[in-house]
């Protein structure tokens, strides 16, 4: 059995996608791409929910938008039952509740 077999997820999982892009044009392109597929949490930090196939497609398309020699794109899986909390200023106005990620993949 391949070593990466245990890393494959078939169910929906949460991932943090973050980047450091050196060129403003590439930065804008990547931001516009990710904003349609994930939820922005902070500048250059997004929450992506999907299975392995969706994540791979998202990242492969994102790689096409960056310069791999100058830019940095990272993906971190979040544990399914891990603590997810926000401390500090609220992201949304009071009374507004977040119901999920964008429907369009």
UniProtKB/Swiss-Prot annotation:
Positions contributing to Mg(2+) binding: 20
Source species taxonomy: Bacteria, Pseudomonadati, Pseudomonadota, Betaproteobacteria, Nitrosomonadales
NCBIfam families assigned: cas2
Name used for this protein in its record: CRISPR-associated endoribonuclease Cas2 1
InterPro entries with a match to the protein in the record: CRISPR_associated_Cas2, Virulence_VapD/CRISPR_Cas2
Hydrolase in keyword set: yes
Stretches that traverse the bilayer: none
EC number(s) given by UniProt: 3.1.-.-
Entry superkingdom: Bacteria
Gene Ontology terms: biological process: defense response to virus; maintenance of CRISPR repeat elements
Quaternary assembly: Homodimer, forms a heterotetramer with a Cas1 homodimer.
Molecular function via GO: metal ion binding; RNA endonuclease activity
Cofactor: Mg(2+)
